Curated annotation (Swiss-Prot):
Any one GO cellular component localisation term in the record: cytoplasm
Known function: Fodrin, which seems to be involved in secretion, interacts with calmodulin in a calcium-dependent manner and is thus candidate for the calcium-dependent movement of the cytoskeleton at the membrane. Plays a critical role in central nervous system development and function.
Keyword Zinc: no
Record-level GO BP terms: actin cytoskeleton organization; actin filament capping; central nervous system development; central nervous system formation
Any one GO molecular-function label of the UniProt entry: actin binding
Protein localization: Cytoplasm, Cytoskeleton; Cytoplasm, Myofibril, Sarcomere, M line; Cytoplasm, Cytosol; Cell membrane
Subunit structure, as described in the record: Interacts with ANK2. Interacts with CPNE4 (via VWFA domain). Like erythrocyte spectrin, the spectrin-like proteins are capable to form dimers which can further associate to tetramers. Associates with the gamma-tubulin complex in brain, but not in kidney, liver, sperm, or uterus. Interacts with CAMSAP1. Can form heterodimers with SPTAN1.
Entry keywords, A to Z: Actin capping, Actin-binding, Calmodulin-binding, Cell membrane, Cytoplasm, Cytoskeleton, Membrane, Phosphoprotein, Repeat
Source superkingdom: Eukaryota
The organism of origin for this protein: Capra hircus
Protein family according to the UniProt entry: Belongs to the spectrin family.
Modified residues (Phosphotyrosine): 27
Per-repeat ranges for Spectrin: 1-10, 11-19, 20-31
Protein name: Spectrin beta chain, non-erythrocytic 1
């Protein structure tokens, strides 16, 4: 369970980073 929790935290971190990059990229496109 602990390992799963750590993996989920890592996944969540990566997902947020990816989402931020996508938002930044689309912002640059529409600027």
């Amino acid at each position: 369970v602990l390992l799963l929790s750590q993996d989920y935290g890592k996944y969540k971190e990566v997902a947020e980073l990816t989402r931020t990059q996508i938002l930044a990229a689309s912002y640059e496109l529409h600027k």
